[in-house]
């Protein structure tokens, strides 16, 4: 009955109003081309979203790495002619292609062959208004930063007429789930946020967030490795007053964990990384800002409250002058640490993400011979990552900043020792959340191996060891801290919290994790972070992957299994 009513004009209008209040960026109005799909066309709509994600990914990086990033330019108008929808719509071919964004008309003809995200999404909107698909997941002024000023033709005069379209069954179901999601107060652990997010995110956005490399063995092992570590708690200890605060690089923080850098947060919520900044600020937890954020760096930095700490995650560009500008700007804006990603000379095969890109290709372009099957929202980023980055570049990076320098993506003890030799302030034991090389070891397993070596060589007090990947519980954080980690990073859990409930969801997730840490410190018999030592753990099974462990049903329930190839839909579909 609900679906039937939605298909009437009045009911659809009413539901749009409701959906706009629930999430104005996911569902805007009857003019929204993405979400206003005809019946049975959910596949096409998801394809457009997938293409937009690819465009967002590459343009975010391109935007950050333009040489004139910090230079403004005057924008000329096009021959003083009124750029009406009728005129713009005539420029809809590859050799004469205009697009409207934010009420402004751009000539993308010359840019089309060089667009790192591919030509398909631009061609799809040739001679049309692409604002609705572009704005929700891009930093402001992105176009102006990477399209030459002379290609900005001027303002659109008038509006494009939009066709009334009917919602698909799948989209109606998703919007109904958003309406029925439980109140924030019912979230009692980080798994709960993921459960909700998986039901309300558009499929391409979910695929981008949850995808991992190849068979996703490392993704699951990152979490499962914590199940092979058990506690040896102390008893009869006065634990009335427990303090979970710590210091990172000499700066006090309320908890021993931080929010890891993740790309394209606006896919889940219209405020994106700004929502994460707000939620983290309320709880005095460090946020690491991604190079590939969907909000601009300055937007995220501006969202800080006084005293709030943020770190900057960096992909090094082949043009070192571009990297230098970005690093110096981050330092000027008060970033407290520079985290250089070193595990991505090329981005991994994230097949859930790639399958969404395949659907987009088949809908936009009929000739399969021209489709680049290596692409997806993730791999589209790789053209901006310098594969020649090596240890010799550390000296250059140290010369351009006074921020503490940490390399993120270390996966073996030998490289931890090299980092110490190069005078780095820290490393993050990480495999990119299982999104790069599959069958790499879980970071917590590497942590258990490397810390005794550092202590033996007297290096454990000279370099900070951070760890991320697979963390879902306060007990996971405590296990890593007992093994010697300085801090523990979480990425996806906070994306899911933000996607489900915005900045308040981020705050709630932090509070839940803090509560778990404090409670379990009491049960362990410790009062301070400094009292967490290896003696409180039984790690005899950490390296033995054949040891059976109790199933984590909440984690398994949320894990989205990979699927094989699918046939094309039939005519009746």
From Swiss-Prot:
Q: Sorted alphabetically, which keywords does the UniProt record give?
A: Electron transport, Flavoprotein, FMN, Heme, Iron, Metal-binding, Mitochondrion, Oxidoreductase, Respiratory chain, Transit peptide, Transport
A Pfam family matched by this chain, by name? FMN_dh
Binding residues for pyruvate: 208, 315, 432, 435
Catalyzed reactions? (S)-lactate + 2 Fe(III)-[cytochrome c] = 2 Fe(II)-[cytochrome c] + pyruvate + 2 H(+)
Function field: Catalyzes the oxidation of (S)-lactate (L-lactate) to pyruvate with subsequent transfer of electrons to cytochrome c. Is involved in the utilization of (S)-lactate as a sole source of carbon for growth.
Cite the GO molecular-function annotations of the record.
heme binding; L-lactate dehydrogenase (cytochrome) activity; metal ion binding
Q: Could you say which EC number(s) this protein's record lists?
A: 1.1.2.3
The family annotation for this protein states:
In the N-terminal section; belongs to the cytochrome b5 family. In the C-terminal section; belongs to the FMN-dependent alpha-hydroxy acid dehydrogenase family.
Sequence positions that bind FMN? 260-263, 290, 313, 341, 408, 468-472, 491-492
Residue ranges constituting the FMN hydroxy acid dehydrogenase domain according to the UniProt record: 182-542
Q: Which GO biological process entries does UniProt record here?
A: lactate metabolic process
Output the Gene Ontology cellular-component terms.
mitochondrial intermembrane space
Report the co-factor binding details. Answer: Binds 1 heme b (iron(II)-protoporphyrin IX) group non-covalently per subunit.
The Swiss-Prot or TrEMBL record lists the needed cofactor(s) as: FMN; heme b
Q: Where is the transit peptide?
A: 1-73
Q: Which PANTHER family match?
A: L-LACTATE DEHYDROGENASE (CYTOCHROME), S -2-HYDROXY-ACID OXIDASE-RELATED
- The UniProt annotation places heme b binding at 115, 138, 208, 357
Q: Where is the Cytochrome b5 heme-binding domain?
A: 80-157
Where in or outside the cell it occurs: the entry states: Mitochondrion intermembrane space
Q: How does it assemble?
A: Homotetramer.
Which InterPro entries did the record assign?
Aldolase_TIM, Cyt_B5-like_heme/steroid-bd, Cyt_B5-like_heme/steroid_sf, Cyt_B5_heme-BS, FMN-dep_DH, FMN_HAD, FMN_hydac_DH_AS, L-MDH/L-LDH_FMN-bd
Biological source species: Wickerhamomyces anomalus
What's the protein called, per UniProt? L-lactate dehydrogenase (cytochrome)
Q: Which CDD domains match?
A: FCB2_FMN (cd02922)
Q: What is known of its domains?
A: Consists of two discrete domains, an N-terminal cytochrome b domain and a C-terminal flavin-binding domain. In addition there is an extended C-terminal tail. The cytochrome b domain is required for efficient cytochrome c reduction.
């Amino acid at each position: 009955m609900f679906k039937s009513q939605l298909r009437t004009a009045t009911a659809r209008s009413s539901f749009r109003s409701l959906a706009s209040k629930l999430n104005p960026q996911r569902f805007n109005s009857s003019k929204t081309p993405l979400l206003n799909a005809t019946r049975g066309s959910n596949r096409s709509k998801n394809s457009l979203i997938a293409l937009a994600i690819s465009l967002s990914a590459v343009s975010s990086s391109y935007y950050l790495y333009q040489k004139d990033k910090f230079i403004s330019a005057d924008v000329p108008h096009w021959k003083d002619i009124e750029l009406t929808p009728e005129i713009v719509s005539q420029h809809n071919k590859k050799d004469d292609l205009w697009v409207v964004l934010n009420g402004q008309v751009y000539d993308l003809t010359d840019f089309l062959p060089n667009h790192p995200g591919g030509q398909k999404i631009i061609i799809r909107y040739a001679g049309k208004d692409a604002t609705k698909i572009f704005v929700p997941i891009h930093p402001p002024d992105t176009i102006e930063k990477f399209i030459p000023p002379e290609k900005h033709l001027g303002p659109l005069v008038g509006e494009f007429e939009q066709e009334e379209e009917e919602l698909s069954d799948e989209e109606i179901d998703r919007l109904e789930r958003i309406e029925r999601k439980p109140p924030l107060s019912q979230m009692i652990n980080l798994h709960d946020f993921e459960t909700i997010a998986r039901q309300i995110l558009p499929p391409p956005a979910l695929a981008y967030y949850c995808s991992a490399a190849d068979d996703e063995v490392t993704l699951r092992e990152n979490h499962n490795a914590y199940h092979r570590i058990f506690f040896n708690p102390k008893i009869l200890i006065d634990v009335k007053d427990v303090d979970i605060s710590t210091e990172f690089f000499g700066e006090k923080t309320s908890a021993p964990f931080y929010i890891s850098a993740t790309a394209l947060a606006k896919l889940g919520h219209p405020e994106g990384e700004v929502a994460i900044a707000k939620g983290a600020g309320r709880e005095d937890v460090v946020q690491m800002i991604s190079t590939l954020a969907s909000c601009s760096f300055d937007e995220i930095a501006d969202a800080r409250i006084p005293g709030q700490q943020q770190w900057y995650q960096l992909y090094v560009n082949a043009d070192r002058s571009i990297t230098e500008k970005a690093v110096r700007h981050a330092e000027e804006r008060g970033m407290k640490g520079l985290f250089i990603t070193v595990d991505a000379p090329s981005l991994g095969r994230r097949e859930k993400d790639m399958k969404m890109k395949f659907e987009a290709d088949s809908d936009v372009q009929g000739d399969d011979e021209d489709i680049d099957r290596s692409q997806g929202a993730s791999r589209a980023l790789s053209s901006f990552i310098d594969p020649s980055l090596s240890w010799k570049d550390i000296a250059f990076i140290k010369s351009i900043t006074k921020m503490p320098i940490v390399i993120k993506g270390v996966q073996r003890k030998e490289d931890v020792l090299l980092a110490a030799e190069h005078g780095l302030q820290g490393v993050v034991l990480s495999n990119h959340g299982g999104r790069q090389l599959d069958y790499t070891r879980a970071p917590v397993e590497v942590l258990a191996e490397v810390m005794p070596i550092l202590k033996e060589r007297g290096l454990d007090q000279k370099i900070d060891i951070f760890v991320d990947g697979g963390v879902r519980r306060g007990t996971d954080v405590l296990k890593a801290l007992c093994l010697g980690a300085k801090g523990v990073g979480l990425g996806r859990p906070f994306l899911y919290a933000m996607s489900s409930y915005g900045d308040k969801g981020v705050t709630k997730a932090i509070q839940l994790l803090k509560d778990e840490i404090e409670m379990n410190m009491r049960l362990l018999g410790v009062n301070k972070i400094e009292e967490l030592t290896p003696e409180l753990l039984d790690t005899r099974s950490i390296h033995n992957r054949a040891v059976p462990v109790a199933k984590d049903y909440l984690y398994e329930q949320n894990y989205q299994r990979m699927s094989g190839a699918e046939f094309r839909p039939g005519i009746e579909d």
